[in-house]
Swiss-Prot record:
UniProt name for this protein: Maturase K
Residues making up the signal peptide according to the UniProt record: none
The keyword Plastid appears for this protein: yes
Compartmental location: Plastid, Chloroplast
Classification via HAMAP family: MatK
GO biological process: mRNA processing; RNA splicing; tRNA processing
Stated family: Belongs to the intron maturase 2 family. MatK subfamily.
GO molecular function: RNA binding
GO cellular component terms attached to this protein's record: chloroplast
Keywords: Chloroplast, mRNA processing, Plastid, RNA-binding, tRNA processing
Purpose of the protein: Usually encoded in the trnK tRNA gene intron. Probably assists in splicing its own and other chloroplast group II introns.
InterPro entries: Domain_X, Maturase_MatK, Maturase_MatK_N
Length: 503
């Protein structure tokens, strides 16, 4: 047990950091506005065109501690004018500034961790597509998979306790506790039994959510790494990139401190793989379902007894990869069994050898994508293209450029699809919707307007990869078509298109 004691000890080097005085610094709110916001709520209110001062912030914090923070003095006309437009205005102001402040210990921790590990500062691992080559390489050798929705409708006090390991300033923690209890209902939005963050306060709650996720993953991945026979250094660097200002090895809090070696033996599996995305996680293993069940109940106990998040074990299904398809970041993942029969002739005897190989497939589900196009008024619910209403002063080139940008973004994101039929249909919908929009603007028929545009208009909807491959292999058309039909993963995609994010 002594050899693992270093993993359990939290870093005490920054216990004397006091973050509370930073709340009264004006540049903190300017920093939050410049880096985290598209628009400043401070400049949208009549009668207030200056930056938030320390006096304003002090008044806001004072009202948080009061029983009725919405009662203002009748003589304070400037405050009534400032606060009257949005009763949650000052909660947004403080949340924006507080989010910047509490990120400071994590950012300092990240910089020191990178300097200590001397990890390569590559941006490729931040790409969404960086996970697909990993899945393509691993999933074809695995047998069982389980997709789980991570519960994060947690108690407010658990959020504060999670930050206690990082933020040692008691005043800041007390302010956060009062702030969350007072404005919890206005900062979150219930939707289909899932709590999502309000668009007005995304930074603070994304930070709190990631801190909560990193807390449980530190325990989970620590047991996984210690019990594995194969320690991969590349996976450590990978997790540095996707985690939120944190290094996995830097803080670990294990529930089961008694008989630790038995716990490690209990979870021993060199082929257990873990992937997290969009509030969900994937567990995949090569072993029998028994080991998957062990990890399943470990996660349930961890969430229920450590984070006080209610979760039913029956909601975690364990499926065979060869019989199960998984919706993952706009793709539908599956492992298909390809069987081939080989005839072998040895002297006078012949044998038939049946070889079965697993192939990892990534398919673009067309029905959800058509639903997203329908909501954006590019087509109806059946997938028939329709004209999109446009502004009267929009030029033809602006309309065409908008459709081309959407088409190329979708094609760029779904370039890893093993079957391109869905992409061809999406291109057809966007191309014909563009023609109908232009024809509606000029009050002409679609056929007449399409003749006017000519074949050059259709060529503009070719994606970049099609154009590049056609230039490189212009003499061998079959080669370029075969390469384009293959899977292409780009390492510069850092966000999901709105039309793709249909989950």
């Amino acid at each position: 047990m002594e050899e693992f004691q270093g993993y359990f000890e939290l870093d005490r080097s920054r216990q004397d950091d006091f973050l509370y005085p930073l709340i009264f610094r004006e540049y903190i709110y300017a920093l939050a506005h410049d880096h985290g916001l598209n628009r400043s709520i401070l400049f949208e209110n009549a009668g207030y065109y200056n930056k938030s001062s320390s006096i304003i912030v002090k008044r806001l914090i004072t009202r948080i501690y009061q029983q009725n923070p919405l009662i203002f003095s009748a003589n304070d006309s400037i405050q009534n004018q400032f606060f009257g437009h949005n009763k949650n205005l000052y909660s947004q102001i403080i949340s924006e500034g507080f989010a910047v402040i509490v990120e400071i210990p994590f950012s300092l921790r990240l910089v020191s961790s990178l300097e200590r590990k001397q990890x390569a500062k590559s941006h490729n691992l931040r790409s969404i597509h960086x996970i697909f080559p990993f899945l393509e390489d691993k999933f074809s050798h695995l047998d069982y998979v389980s997709a789980v929705l991570i519960p994060y409708h947690i108690h407010l006090e658990i959020v504060v306790q999670t930050l206690r390991y990082w933020v040692k300033d008691a005043s800041s923690l007390h302010l956060l506790r009062f702030f969350l209890h007072e404005y919890w209902n206005s900062l979150i939005t219930p939707k289909k039994h899932i709590t999502i963050f309000s668009k007005g306060n995304p930074r603070l709650f994304l930070f709190l959510y990631n801190x909560h996720i990193c807390e449980y993953e530190s325990i989970f991945l620590f047991l996984r790494n210690q019990s594995s026979h194969l320690r991969s250094t590349s996976s450590g660097i990978f997790f540095e990139r996707i985690h939120f200002y944190v290094k996995i090895e830097d803080f670990v809090k294990v529930l089961f401190e008694n008989d630790f070696q038995c716990i490690l033996w209990f979870f021993k599996d060199p082929f257990m793989h873990y992937v997290r995305y969009q509030g969900k996680l994937i567990l995949a293993s090569k072993d029998t379902p028994l080991l998957m069940n062990k990890w399943k109940y470990y996660l349930v106990n961890l969430w229920q007894y450590h984070f006080y998040a209610w979760f039913q074990p029956g909601r975690i299904d364990i499926n065979q990869l060869c019989k199960y398809s998984l919706d993952f970041l706009g793709y539908r993942l599956s492992v298909r069994l390809n069987s081939s029969v080989v005839r072998s002739q040895m002297l006078e005897n012949s044998f038939l050898i049946n070889n079965t190989m697993k192939k990892f497939e990534t398919i673009v589900p067309i029905i959800p994508l058509i639903g997203s196009l329908s909501k954006a008024n590019f087509c109806n619910t059946l997938g028939h293209p329709i004209s999109k209403p446009t502004r009267a002063d929009s030029s033809d080139s602006d309309i065409i450029d908008r459709f081309l940008r959407i088409c190329r973004n979708l094609s760029h994101y779904h370039s890893g699809s093993s079957k391109k039929k869905s992409l061809y249909r999406v291109k057809y919908i966007l191309r014909l919707s563009c023609v109908k929009t232009l024809a509606r603007k000029h009050k002409r028929t679609v056929r007449t307007f399409l003749k006017r545009l000519g074949s050059e208009f259709l060529e503009e909807f070719l994606t970049e990869e099609e154009v590049v491959l056609s230039l490189i292999f212009h003499r061998t058309y079959s080669t370029s078509r075969r390469l384009y039909r293959g899977q292409i993963w780009y390492l510069d995609i850092t966000s999901i298109n709105d039309l793709v994010n249909y989950e």
